[in-house]
Amino acid sequence: MEFSVKNGSVEKQRTGCLVVGVYEPRRLSPAAEQLDKLSDGYLSNLLRKGDLEGRVGQTLLLHNVPNVPADRVLLVGCGKERELTERQYKQTIQKMVQVINDTGSTEAICFLTELHVKARSVYWNIRFAIEAIQENGYQYNEFKSVKPEIRRELRKIVFNIANRKDLTVSEQAVEQGKAVALGVIAAKNVANCPPNVCNPKYLSGLAKGLAKEYDNITTTVLDEKEMAALQMNAYLAVSRGSENDAYLSIIEYKGSPNPAAKPIVLVGKGLTFDTGGISIKPSDAMDEMKYDMGGAASVYGTMKAIAEMKLPLNVIGVLAGCENMPDGNAYRPGDILTTMSGLTVEVLNTDAEGRLVLCDTLTYVERFDPELVIDVATLTGACMIALGNHNSGLISPNNTLANDLLNAAEQADDKAWRLPMGEEYQEQLKSNFADLANIGGRLGGAITAGVFLSNFTKKYTWAHLDIAGTAWKSGAAKGATGRPVPLLSQFLINKAGV
């Protein structure tokens, strides 16, 4: 899809479809009012007859509107004026695309980005519209023998802006919106890939592919022999039951004009399939455990997005690829593992494997002397119980970093909620036989998992995002969401100051 912006009068637009808003109850938006005057009251006459009330999601497609040069005019309901929320705005944008795709139009000029969305700017309206449109058109058909028929559909959208002074920021919104949407799609494609294809080696191949695609990215991959030499014993214990070797992929993006600038490090849990190991999961919905690499997928997508945007930052993305399978060689409940940091961990449940992979990875990234580290993981079912599918869980001992992430989450409409930390949660991780237990009991499971990781992050500023509830959807709409690529991308945009 091609996107652009311009500043022009609605009555002069020659296009396949002109899109304007209608407020509830039956009130024309400013752009629609101009069309109404041009057409001698044609639109207002239709509203008086009750053809469109203006509720969010309602549409009315018109042909041959008097004196209007556009082939079609699409009226889109926008709800009550000045009360439009982000969610409703997304509905209006996606409904617009759905309707136009059912016509013969391949291009459209959209005036919906001129609408007032609560506490949002023109920049946000345009960027979010692009992300919503790309999300609406996403399909994963890689493994279908009969591909859906590709029909003539919308290929170009021009967003009109009311004030010429907003052109520069609007053009930036287009470029950043396209990049973030591309990152989200990349993350979805990786996460949706079946586990018999997307194993840890496949994941490392994708990481290497970024280095070939972008000049300012280099990729290093560690195999199990190299990890063993580094004493990454907890990570490797999880991998022991699988015939697919573990691989740790390090993607280095250098965009800062100061090559010595400390990097921001993103660590993604990459369990390409998680059976639970010896503590095996129930069979119901186990197929969805291919999404246990959602953290790695989102880091991969974010690295792609920032490379597209050419952000002036140094960022390192780490994909911790591994598979947790039951086998005669698999690690067991009761095992005690010596981590790369030297701390020992008693395994009480082999299905709490993500934190074992991450603890060694978090120790490994100390060598980069990072400005800060954010790990992203589908870590706990407890986070899903606590926050549902709407908010990612956030844990950090650093208020500044936590607030920066929450601010980015709000800006990107990729919500997160901060969970507490404290010594009392550390108490739940005590072991009679080792420095730590790998689980802390049923209560506060999302928090104790994050607190467990905090023991391996003492040498840098750190935050943890638990995306177990937000990385994918179940049911009829089953599939990866690409979250939290928008949150992470926005955080990095803010850090870059662009």
From Swiss-Prot:
The primary location reported for this protein is cytoplasm
Looking up Gene3D superfamilies in the UniProt record yields: Leucine Aminopeptidase, subunit E, domain 1, Zn peptidases
Q: How is the cofactor bound?
A: Binds 2 manganese ions per subunit.
| Location of the protein in the cell | Cytoplasm
Q: Which positions are annotated as binding Mn(2+) 2?
A: 269, 274, 292, 353
Catalysis performed (reactions): Release of an N-terminal amino acid, Xaa-|-Yaa-, in which Xaa is preferably Leu, but may be other amino acids including Pro although not Arg or Lys, and Yaa may be Pro. Amino acid amides and methyl esters are also readily hydrolyzed, but rates on arylamides are exceedingly low; Release of an N-terminal amino acid, preferentially leucine, but not glutamic or aspartic acids
InterPro entries the record matches: Leucine_aapep/pepB (IPR011356), Macro_dom-like (IPR043472), Peptidase_M17_C (IPR000819), Peptidase_M17_leu_NH2_pept (IPR023042), Peptidase_M17_N (IPR008283)
Q: What is its EC number?
A: 3.4.11.1, 3.4.11.10
- Swiss-Prot/TrEMBL keywords: Aminopeptidase, Cytoplasm, Hydrolase, Manganese, Metal-binding, Protease
Give any single GO term for biological process. proteolysis
Its required cofactor(s), as named, are:
Mn(2+)
Q: Which positions does UniProt annotate for Mn(2+) 1 binding?
A: 274, 351, 353
Which principal EC class is assigned to this enzyme?
A: hydrolase
Active-site residues from the entry: 281, 355
Q: Which GO terms describe its cellular component?
A: cytoplasm
GO MF term list: manganese ion binding; metalloaminopeptidase activity
Q: Tell me the function of this protein.
A: Presumably involved in the processing and regular turnover of intracellular proteins. Catalyzes the removal of unsubstituted N-terminal amino acids from various peptides.
Family note: Belongs to the peptidase M17 family.
What is the protein named? Probable cytosol aminopeptidase
Which species expresses this protein natively?
Answer: Glaesserella parasuis serovar 5 (strain SH0165) (Haemophilus parasuis)
